[in-house]
């Protein structure tokens, strides 16, 4: 049996996922990054003082692989040390932590990855998110969600024809994540849709856009070839 947290705090509320979660769970707490900066533990601790919080859904992150290649220290501050701060806060509050990670933690050489498969990132963005996972694993009452999502309308004129993914529209992912939050599960959980190329995903999402093909060889940053996810545990524990 599942139930909603008494009080849910969401980090990264101004982002794509945050806006989608807010529409589904408007009674949760969505502090802005200016008042709840994950790189500033003292500020976070002051903000939660006097508030009853039993679950933190941590999605605040620096998520652009090419920009992280240019500025890896910012990724260290936000994605690794910021997550360490959130872990510390949850320990102090005795709150459950649900951490939004990425399918990119996998090497991408075969796809259909299970939760217990070996992780080996191919770019700095994914290494920084894996660093966050390592911090979260120090908590007993925590859940790591590996997923991939994008806007409800595909935003680009081209998409990778040679990269395989389990990506879903953010509105779908937000609902799936909240069901995972409400489940009370701990450990690692994969959240995603069917295995398909990013191009097939884009064309299914936005057929009127006539998205054209792009190759991973055409971009300057490293892209894993197949990070599709096995979601058997999600379907078994939570449902479709």
Please tell me what each predicted stretch does.
Residues 120-148:
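Active-site Tyr-X1-5-Lys
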Residues 26-47:
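Adenosine-cofactor binding site in Rossmann-like domains, unifying the SAM/SAH pocket
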Residues 41-78, 89-91:
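NAD(P)H-binding glycine-rich loop region in Rossmannoid oxidoreductase-like domains
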Residues 84-120:
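Conserved Rossmann-fold NAD(P)-dependent oxidoreductase catalytic core, especially the SDR/UDP-sugar
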Residues 39, 70, 74-85, 119, ...:
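Glycine-rich NAD(P)-binding loop of the Rossmann-fold in SDR/ketoreductase-type enzymes
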Residues 141, 147-154, 164-191, 196:
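Alpha-helical substrate-binding/gating segment
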Residues 2-25:
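N-terminal Rossmann NAD(P)H-binding glycine-rich loop of SDR-like oxidoreductase domains
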Residues 176-226, 230:
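Mid/C-terminal beta-alpha module of Rossmann-like enzyme folds, strongest
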């Amino acid at each position: 049996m599942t139930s909603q947290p008494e009080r849910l705090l969401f980090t990264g509320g101004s982002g794509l996922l945050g806006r989608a979660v807010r529409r589904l769970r408007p009674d949760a707490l969505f502090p802005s990054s200016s008042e709840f900066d994950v790189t500033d533990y003292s500020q976070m601790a002051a903000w939660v003082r006097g508030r009853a919080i039993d679950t933190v859904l941590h999605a605040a992150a620096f998520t652009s692989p090419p920009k992280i290649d240019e500025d890896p220290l910012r990724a260290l501050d936000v994605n690794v040390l910021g997550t360490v701060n959130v872990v510390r806060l949850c320990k102090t509050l005795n709150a459950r932590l649900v951490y939004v990670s990425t399918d990119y933690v996998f090497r991408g050489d075969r796809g259909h990855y299970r939760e217990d498969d070996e992780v080996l990132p191919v770019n700095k963005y994914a290494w920084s998110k894996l660093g966050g996972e390592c911090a979260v694993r120090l908590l007993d009452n925590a859940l790591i969600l590996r997923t991939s999502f994008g806007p409800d309308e595909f935003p680009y004129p081209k998409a990778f024809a040679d990269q395989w993914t389990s990506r879903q529209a953010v509105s779908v992912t937000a609902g799936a994540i909240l069901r995972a939050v409400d489940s009370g599960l701990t450990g690692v959980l994969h959240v995603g849709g069917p295995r398909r190329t990013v191009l097939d995903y884009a064309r299914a999402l936005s057929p009127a856009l006539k998205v054209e093909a792009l190759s991973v060889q055409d971009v300057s940053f490293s892209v894993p070839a197949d990070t599709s996810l096995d979601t058997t545990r999600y379907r078994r524990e939570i449902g479709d």
